[in-house]
Amino acid sequence: MLAPFACQPGESRGRQKPESMSTFRSPFQRDRDRIIHSSAFRRLKHKTQVFVEHEGDYYRTRLTHSIEVAQVARTISGVLGLNTDLAECIALAHDLGHTPFGHTGEDALARLMEPYGGFDHNAQAMRIVTRLERHYAEFDGLNLTWESLEGIAKHNGPVEGPLPYALAEANAQWDLELHTYASAEAQVAAIADDVAYSHHDLHDGLRSGLFTEADLMELPVTAPAFDEVDALYPGLEPMRRRHEALRRVFGRMVEDVIAVAQGRLEAAQPKSVEEIRQMGATVIRFSKPLYQELKVIRSFLFHRMYRAPSVMKERAKVTAVVNDLFPLFMARPELLPQEWRRDVEAAADETTLARIVADYVAGMTDRFALQEHARLCG
């Protein structure tokens, strides 16, 4: 049974294009299923978060990460009486707008798009689900419910200041109330992202040899976990020791989020999702002690993983790939695939063309971007 402050599927604000109700699935289940079956979701299989060529087995892809985020979101939302389908839907959609080559690729594309309104992966996810997926006879995009769109747009909180192009375009159509907080389900999806990447980046970094268990014995959160495992299982083989320690780190993060949320919900006693949106602060968050400890972990990961020599070595290379492909397609849009030509021919100005080229480049997988660069620029 859903809590009164959960998003009730029978009270959805609906879809841009009205559709008949499904006999067997709720509106949010249909949204989730459409995301899973989308082309953009499938492409996440070949997009890495940390790009190191020839070392892909060590690192999560955007697809595996999204699945892990969805699992965490379902767990937390289920305990809190929230709508697990909506939380899962937003979690699965949160990375759809990412470029090839992780944040390095996004930084390069964002710089190239500065004269044309910029580029932001969260806004690009909105563009994908409202416009770029073209599989249905009656609409472009996925025709998601308002609640799913709201969660994609502002799962990280109210959106202030100048809006990225894609988000401004979507908000003009749907009025996503960007000045308010999102539903509790969207907040759960956001913190599930933090839980998942904090956990799996530690795991991936250990597997790839960027740091060792001894390094983690010097850090908060991880050190007590290894101490507990060593006390319970002296002499445990390294791989099992590592897994047992990191699953305890993972469990502590999830339990902390649930405990804090239960306390805040008990204190606020919200009677509806609208009261959640108007609370003026997130109801889903880490406790202050754990948040401070996780800041230490993130700083460690930034220096030892995201700025590791093997990762930095690739940054210039993949930046060049994006820097070469974007202006090439701008100058010669006829090189774009046939299915993109209609949009190119309809482009009224250079800014519109740049947005089309950015859509195409952002949709590339790591492997395809490298192949296209070798073919067209080699």
Swiss-Prot record:
UniProt name for this protein: Deoxyguanosinetriphosphate triphosphohydrolase-like protein
SMART domains listed in its UniProt record? HDc
The family line of this record is: Belongs to the dGTPase family. Type 2 subfamily.
**Short name of one Pfam family for this protein?**
HD
Residue ranges occupied by any HD domain in the UniProt entry: 62-198
* Stored CDD domains: HDc (cd00077)
Give GO BP annotations, semicolon-separated: dGTP catabolic process
Question: Does the record's keyword annotation contain Nucleotidyltransferase?
Answer: no
